[in-house]
């Protein structure tokens, strides 16, 4: 997984970290939470796919890969410990 791409989007949209690994996420729900338009959300989705962070689940939703889940867990632990 390309963590540079994931970190770029997590830094830009901190709310992503709250729901990225919550199961199957629809593009519509993600764009409503992030308050972005559908084309921007689709471009973000394509970057996540090519980075190996998510897998497509149908045509309009995604699921986090194991690598992304582990990465988010690590980030949360570091934030909790103040690193």
Locate each region found by the language model.
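Short amphipathic alpha-helical interface segments
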Residues: 2-32
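Short, cationic-aromatic polyanion-contact patches
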Residues: 3-10, 59-80
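Short amphipathic alpha-helical interaction segments
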Residues: 36-47
């Amino acid at each position: 997984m390309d963590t540079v791409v994931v970190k770029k989007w997590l830094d830009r949209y901190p709310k992503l970290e709250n729901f990225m690994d919550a199961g199957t996420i629809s593009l519509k729900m993600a764009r409503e939470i992030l308050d972005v338009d559908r084309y921007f959300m689709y471009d973000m989705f394509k970057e996540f796919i090519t980075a190996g962070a998510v897998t497509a689940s149908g045509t309009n939703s995604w699921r986090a890969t194991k690598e992304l889940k582990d990465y988010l867990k690590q980030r949360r632990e570091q934030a909790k410990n103040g690193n």
